[in-house]
Each structure stands twice: as structure tokens, then as C-alpha cells.
Amino acid sequence: MDEIESSAVNAAASELRSIIERVERLEEEKAAIANDVKDVLGEAKGRGYDTKAIKTIIRLRKKDANERLEEETILQTYMAALGME
């Protein structure tokens, strides 16, 4: 391998190492955030709130209004078909 190829390989290895280290840092941050969310939900539960309902509301708030309405309509249709309403 000549000097140019060796330099290119070293540059690629350095770039790859940098990418991997960035992903590892982000994974650590994600784990820390997940623990923070767990703590907040534990606090809510301790204050008497239903954490399952809170998680459902958070999931629904992430959707736009049309998507949420469509999901609710389908759910109501299925529940009516099963005699649950």
C-alpha cells in the first residue's frame, strides 16, 4: 500500500471512529433521558395520576389532528361492531 492509500485508510478509520463515538454518546444521552422520563412518570404516579393515561395522551399529542381523528373513528367503529358501545 502506498503512502496515499495509507493516508486514505487512516482518514476513513478516523472518520469511522468519530461516527461510532458520536453514536455511543447519543445512546448514553438517550439512556439518561429515558431514566429522566421514568422518574417523572414515577413522580406523577406518586401524586395519584394514571401513568398509562399520561403515556396515551403523549402518544396522541404527537399525531396531527387528522391522524388522531382517523384513529378514534376506526376505534369507535370496531368497538361498535363488537357491541362495546
UniProtKB/Swiss-Prot annotation:
Leader peptide range in chain numbering: none
Molecular function GO terms recorded: DNA binding
Membrane spanning stretches: none
Pfam families reported in the protein's UniProt record: GapR_DNA-bd (PF10073)
InterPro entries tied to this protein: GapR-like, GapR-like_DNA-bd
Coiled coil: none
Family according to the record: Belongs to the UPF0335 family.
Name of the protein this chain belongs to: UPF0335 protein Oant_1161
Source organism per UniProt: Brucella anthropi (strain ATCC 49188 / DSM 6882 / CCUG 24695 / JCM 21032 / LMG 3331 / NBRC 15819 / NCTC 12168 / Alc 37) (Ochrobactrum anthropi)
